Amino acid sequence: RGKMPFLVGGTGLYLDSVLRGYRMAPVPLNASLRERLTGYDMESLRRYFLSIQRDAHNSTDLLERERLIRAIEIAEFSRDHPTAALQSIQIEPLVIGICLEREELRRKITLRLQTRLQAGMIDEVKHLHDRGVNWERLESFGLEYRYISRYLQHKISHEEMFQILNTRIRQFAKRQETWFRGMGKKGVPIHWMDGPDEEAAFRLIMDPE
């Protein structure tokens, strides 16, 4: 159509999947595998997962048992059913990344979390549960939903919820940085900018050379 598409935000995995042409297949639950993993402690689960999918740990939450078991389930299925093969890239992407000093990034993460909580995210999770979404389902929606759900169940205090979330989101951001560096090694160069410089980004878009 002669239009320039923009893909903004999201995780490194989302961007990588678009640029490298992943085809994702639904992965069924594996009851026998889950039963076998029941006796594994967290460290054993991590080692097992990384042994079958070494390059995935930057995008996967290795701190939560259920998510880690699901990641193993997906990795095992993908190994036996290689349906997520890569297609050749039909585009020449221009990837722009915003680079911030570590302390500034941490400050922004904390501020964003405070803003979301003050804007009513706790009430949103409570409302979803009141409408019939069970706690297990809510915890699968992401970090914020997981720990807000635990707070609403009186498993942790408000302060514990905030501190855990702040730490986990920072850890996730660090893993994303590692993922983006890996994209460059895989042939997807990223043009890094010091902060959100809109004019510099516009110049780069208009004249990528």
Feature-to-residue mapping (PLM):
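Phosphate/pyrophosphate-binding catalytic cores of soluble transferases and nucleic-acid-acting enzymes
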Residues: 1-209
